[in-house]
Amino acid sequence: MIPVRQVLPDAVADIIRKAPLTPEKVAFAWRSVVGPAIAQATSVSWGDGILRVQAKDRSWQREVERSSALIRARLDALLGERVVRYIDVRSA
């Protein structure tokens, strides 16, 4: 028997992929791929393939920028390739 912890991430990813593409879906995917610390330190909006990330300060901005290639790859896996074409990160 396959453990649930091995099947669940794939099942959730499949459900997310099949849901209609909305800004809320992209925001949910963001929280899922970056984890609780970055999710809590940022807010996002999405449109025209651009994910706009508002970080609460410069250190979080740098962290997101540093991790942007990995974040994009994970977003591509959840949302489909090129849904997020660019991540624009700014700080308050």
Where is each model-derived feature located?
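A short interface-forming secondary-structure element
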Residues: 48-68, 90
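Short amphipathic beta-strand starts and helix->beta connectors
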Residues: 35-40
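N-terminal presequence-like segments and adjacent domain-start helices
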Residues: 1-32, 43-48, 69, 79-92
